[in-house]
Amino acid sequence: MEIIRGAPALSTFRVQKLMEACVSAALPVRQIYAEYVHLADLSELLKPTEREQLEKILTYGPAIEAHTPQGSLLFVTPRPGTISPWSSKATDIAHNCGLGKVKRLERGIAYYVESDTLTAEQQRTLQGLLHDRMVEVVLNDFAKADVLFKRTEPAPFKSVNVLAEGRRALEVANVEMGLALAEDEIDYLVENFVRLNRNPNDIELMMFAQANSEHCRHKIFNADWTIDGKAQPKSLFKMIKNTFEVTPDHVLSAYKDNAAVMEGSVAGRFFPDPNGVYSYHTEPMHVLMKVETHNHPTAISPYPGAATGSGGEIRDEGATGRGSKPKAGLTGFSVSNLKIPGFVQPWEGNYGKPDRIVSALDIMTEGPLGGAAFNNEFGRPALLGYFRTYEQEVSSHNGVEMRGYHKPIMLAGGLGNIREEHVQKGEITVGAKLIVLGGPAMNIGLGGGAASSMASGQSSEDLDFASVQRENPEMERRCQEVIDRCWQLGDKNPIQFIHDVGAGGLSNAFPELVNDGDRGGIFNLRNVPSDEPGMSPLEIWCNESQERYVLSVAAEDLPLFTAICERERAPFAVVGEAIQEQHLTLADSHFDNNPIDLPLEVLLGKAPKMSRNVVSAKAVSPALEQSQIDVKDAVKRVLSLPTVADKTFLITIGDRTVTGLVNRDQMVGPWQVPVADCAVTAASFDTYAGEAMSLGERTPLALLDFGASARMAVAESIMNIAGADIGSFKRIKLSANWMSAAGHPGEDAGLYEAVKAVGEELCPELSLTIPVGKDSMSMKTAWQQDGVNKTVTSPMSLVITAFGVVQDIRNTVTPELRSDKGETSLLLVDLGAGQNRLGGSCLAQVYGELGDVAPDLDDAALLRGFFETMQKLVANKLVIAYHDRSDGGLFTTLVEMAFAGNIGLDIDVEDLQGTDLERLFNEELGAVLQVSRDNAAKIAAQFAIAGVPCHVIGTLADDQCITIKDGAREIFSDTRVALRTVWSETTYRMQAMRDNPACALEEFKLKQDETDLGLTVNLSFDPSEDVAAPYILKGAAPKMAILREQGVNSHVEMAAAFDRAGFESRDVHMSDILSGRISLEEFQGLVACGGFSYGDVLGAGEGWAKSILFNERARNEFSRFFERDSSFALGVCNGCQMLSNLKEIIPGSEHWPRFVRNRSERFEARFSLVEVQQSPSLFFQGMAGSRMPIAVSHGEGHAEFASAQALALAEASGTIALRFVNGKGEIATQYPQNPNGSPNGLTGICTTDGRVTLMMPHPERVFRTVANSWHPDNWGEDSPWMRMFRNARVNLG
């Protein structure tokens, strides 16, 4: 084992945060220094030149001054017996650089701690701050790290002696293994194994437990129900299916696959043909939809819990039909009170929590980062979300009890597209190869399905930790590229049948695969790729290692499938073969036995059906006491409630522009305020048709009225999507995610009431279908604290996601108020018809109360009338701005619209009934519309004809004040900036705690700056002029290499941009160049695309660059290309980072910087303002002086020069092509206008001859006007960024 010292691991402010954590934990620590240490497992000693090469490969990241280590060593490494994602990718890079003697690279962090003598307890506390015990260990000596490379002998399976010891043996195994088997399931297993005359093996029991867990089988939703002694006619699932029976319109697949599918629009699907050339394929773009929850793992370990939640949902989408394409994602969180240090709110008590779960604050610090990071690295934009905090002592049908989300909701969902011929799964032919595609088996996530089916507190702490999985999104990206290549082959798609590997691992996935295909299977355990040779058969078969799919491929198609996987560097293995008989055999060649030998009907057959005999209950709660509440205090409290407050800290960490197909993300208007009601995507690059999705959830209402909570969730999802141009209810499909504390008194009957309200009544009445959903039935946390039994039980929680097919994405209306549209009026459409019920409202919550009566949708006809009227107005472009009324009531709706439009309001609520508090803070269904004053009366009349009350409530103000009156009496008045400051303080506090606090403060101050102009545009050219048109007419299209490496994710939109400019865009993978399949000699131009090559493990783009510099064939190819006078190249984002590391082979690049970690030390997804500089760049000719917004999505975009002198030389060279600026056109020096902290706002640079240009922002994602989060009204189809690509075509003549 070679030990190679690396760079410092922590920046100054990260060290400071760690020291603050030590102070909080009362640890006598004086100083901590941390640096990376690399470990190399070698097959033989390296020559001096090879050692030097390895050291160069392992030199990466920002330049931080190294120290001479002092103090005690705590060396944090991956857990022995595992291979970290970092290791597998870094080892890949070493091999691609020709270092075959390196068997494996691994990395740890050496912490040097200077302190007083620590007690054993203090040592444990300190180690807890420095490592994640789920996947890491702490060593006190570098030499001990050689245990990472030790191989252990496989362990055999164990049998449970049912034949001799009977039922008791299985009862003991049930507890020890955490199987969560019900009594009747134990009887079923004993009976079946006695009949088979053999003892069950541990692996068979775990497989049965996973396949039959509540998580996988949905026993409660399929159960028979008796309520208050009366047998109910339908199961919960039957009531959900009723929506499809009543309205099957436009549904192509429901209830039987990994996701549901609805009819989409016809568009030109853009992808490469088998020859690698990208082109449009006009066909139906059907829409798949899926929403999952990952609650249990997120409570235990939020980052990996949320990451693998998103990853698993993405796999569900990709494994729909015979393979499909995930497109856009959503994330949601419900947690208990945050209790932010130094910012604890008056309604936040201190009830406590069990040690084995983390706090709500931890969840909201780490969980969103995990979900965002997975989506970012996979390359799926995260466009939608919700965030609710709730933890309150309430009077319920069980007396006074604590309700809240100690067991959180972590929602992960999204939509994608699928080809018509692949919607239905194919036939698994006898003899077909049964394949696992993706990463290796690791001893993690054991029993996740069964564990998440228990109430938190029933399983042991170690089992809780064992049930969390780990993430490797770059591996999942590679697998998705394989699936993409397969579905792109149309009727030659080699995939017959595909499932993702989720709960239960292969033990659930392979039986499900063969059973769904009416086949059996013979499998070989030792063919499963494994990173931990010491695992037992149970651990290999049942672990929940992520990023895996199982599929069947006909034997004759195996060579084609193999070639695709090898090109994409996606690992796969043939594990078994399909057989006619529905029997499952798992052979173990190592021990020469069969750990599994079972008829499938025993595993998946007639396990006993559940019966629920329950009693209903009704809560009685007093009305909200209003007399002591001051309106000004209510405003401050409601705007500070995280459910209502600014959610920027959850949004800018997630890429919202990848794919180039995003029309509407969370951020709205020139000031990019996060208040959008729905997300909208384009179907493709050649159409205005698209897709929309929105969320609806009103969970606290369930504490008063289960049915109302469910109806309001459905209604809110419709109110949120109403601003998109959909047309008909029948083009909207819903996902329903149900969370409940099953078994808690009153909750089961309440769940039944809620499902019935939606499935049997509301949805059928509105022609709405629920073709997909998920349930999580153990939403309760129980523990003992100082001898006292404590519980926190969540409200019955229904989260609805609405998915719609959009007719014209240009018609989408946002909450941005416009002051440049002449005289306008604000209308309140009130579906609550003046009832003003305050039960379960945010107002009640912030005063520690629940209230008495919940708002409700009293008549479905109100919602139908509203939606149909609104859709006509949207299609005819009669609505200027739109925002629904929900959490925080009318007051919140109005101020959020004012924030988005950067303007004041004059509001008069004289026409509305009720007290001031009721009028401003009731959360009845409703919406505010900004319309032309000339049209206001006509529009109000249209709503009246539809049976929906509508009131004119005000206008835009001439100043920046928000004033609310009741006739002549003033109810409330304050400045927009003062209110924005209150609304944004929660996000500031969270950012300051999690990220660089200096950056967080700069952003908070910018929100308070009345002189901030937001995004502005100033162009030096006409974007509607196609300067490339004369050259395109000449005929032959020049060849453009669209270059990608494993983990790159922005290549399709890049190909589309160059295709539109008249190039022949060709898909080129680095494996094509390394293997000699393709030579760069063939191409006039090359573009290195954005993403996460090798997961950025050796610095962003650096691993990719080194695999070129240190590979003889690749180095020669690229050197020859750059030396050609006629060639040109563009590097964007990850491609920019990569090319900046190829300076030694690119002529004229001497002044280039490296691109390293952002100043905020956070991935930054922003819509930022840049100005084109005067430079020789061929891409920017004729564009100098132009100022316009552009998509930014990177974690390592800070331009780092070797010295101040090097920066001065770069400036003097005239090669700086692009800078971040503010709305006044001044160089942006402050965050977030300068999102990465680069000196002088530098974010683009070129060679001295202008042939090679690097830029961190993404022009390819915004080359269409509709793909810009905000744009001036007068832009046409092409945004100004299209000029860049056309300039490249002009340059070739």
UniProtKB/Swiss-Prot annotation:
The keyword ATP-binding applies. The active site is at 1133 (nucleophile), 1258, 1260. It catalyses: N(2)-formyl-N(1)-(5-phospho-beta-D-ribosyl)glycinamide + L-glutamine + ATP + H2O = 2-formamido-N(1)-(5-O-phospho-beta-D-ribosyl)acetamidine + L-glutamate + ADP + phosphate + H(+). It is an enzyme of class 6 (ligase). GO terms for molecular function: ATP binding; metal ion binding; phosphoribosylformylglycinamidine synthase activity. Keywords: ATP-binding, Cytoplasm, Glutamine amidotransferase, Ligase, Magnesium, Metal-binding, Nucleotide-binding, Purine biosynthesis. ATP binds at residues 305-316, 676, 886. Its EC number is 6.3.5.3. NCBIfam families: FGAM_synt (TIGR01735), PRK05297.1 (NF003672). In the N-terminal section; belongs to the FGAMS family. Phosphoribosylformylglycinamidine synthase involved in the purines biosynthetic pathway. Catalyzes the ATP-dependent conversion of formylglycinamide ribonucleotide (FGAR) and glutamine to yield formylglycinamidine ribonucleotide (FGAM) and glutamate. Monomer. This is Phosphoribosylformylglycinamidine synthase.
